[in-house]
């Protein structure tokens, strides 16, 4: 009888540990919006786990939604970060590598931002009006 009680107690304890671990994993996947802009009826959002862009390697999400917040199917998109020339510093253009996801209108972006400071995120995509473009100012820390 004592062994049976110990086994049941151990099974319950393991179940709590597994549930706690699953809860932590699920909450870490949420991303925070860095910036959003509109192009026609489409809202374009740039997000990351931290809600920031930093100097160096960045993993971002580029999303396209309609006025109701529903995903807009975008067959092709590009993302480039531009910093104009300043003084002796030449202009910088950091192109993101985009990959599709299982969600329509959502792309994963990987980009190496060369320096801290103000950048212009330049987005081009195939929308309902043909090739559309949008820009948004972002700050790399």
Model segments located where?
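Contiguous segments within soluble domain cores/interaction surfaces
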Residues: 23-120, 124-141
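C-terminal motif of bacterial Sec signal peptides marking the signal peptidase cleavage site
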Residues: 17-21
């Amino acid at each position: 009888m004592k062994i049976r009680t110990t086994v049941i107690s151990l099974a319950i304890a393991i179940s709590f540990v597994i549930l706690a671990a699953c809860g932590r994993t699920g909450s870490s996947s949420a991303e925070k919006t860095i910036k959003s802009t509109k192009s026609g009826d489409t809202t374009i959002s740039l997000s990351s786990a931290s809600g920031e862009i930093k100097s160096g390697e960045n993993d971002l999400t580029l999303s396209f939604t309609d006025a109701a917040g529903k995903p807009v199917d975008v067959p092709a998109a590009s993302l480039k970060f531009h910093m104009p020339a300043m003084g002796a510093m030449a202009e910088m253009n950091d192109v993101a590598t985009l990959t599709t996801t299982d969600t329509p209108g959502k792309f994963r972006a990987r980009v190496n931002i060369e320096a801290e400071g103000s950048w212009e995120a330049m987005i081009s995509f195939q929308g309902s009006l043909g090739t559309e473009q949008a820009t948004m100012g972002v700050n790399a820390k």
